[in-house]
Amino acid sequence: WPQILRQARRKKALLLFGDEASFAQWGSLSYTWAPKGQPPEVSTSGKRKGYTIFGLIDYFTGQFFYKSHTGRFNSESYAAFLLDVLSQTQQHLIVIQDGARYHTSKAMQVFFETHKGRLTIEQLPAYSPDFNPIEHLWKKVKKEAPQLKYFPDFPDLQAEVNRALLHFAQTPSEITVLMARDCEKLGRVVKAA
């Protein structure tokens, strides 16, 4: 981590933590309070459609890039998202990602090689979502948008999630607050190195 941070500062790069999230039409379950003997109920039709989002957040500024996707995540859709981010930025991008198959596929290796002039990829250790600050953003969006709600119409779910995502895209300071604990831990690692 200290070397990645130094490299990002030296290149004046965006240091982006990436991940994907899925938002279910039937809502997200959570703990809640209710009077004894009166458990809360959320209506559902059994529809199992989900709304998926690719996301990247910048370690330094909280800038948030995202793209919705209605199909399954795959190398092609991930490459399209990264191309969108490359087209929106001028800086070098250092992307820290998990080991999802479509992140590490042969097609993505070719993509990364093709764009190595502006794109550096770093892998998170296996099974370590706790090292990825964007997880806090997904948790917050799920709590604000679909939690304990059922959306009879898929466009209603999309609108609710998009509203929450747009809010965070317009207020990067809120993202830096969400990331603060992780960034503080990462900063301590840098100072100790």
Q: Where are these predicted regions, by residue range?
A:
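Alpha-helix C-cap/termination motif
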Residues: 7-10, 88, 114-115, 167
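A structural preference for long, well-packed, hydrophobic secondary-structure segments
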Residues: 1-2, 6-7, 79-91, 121-128, ...
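C-terminal anion-handling pockets and recognition modules
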Residues: 11-15, 134-193
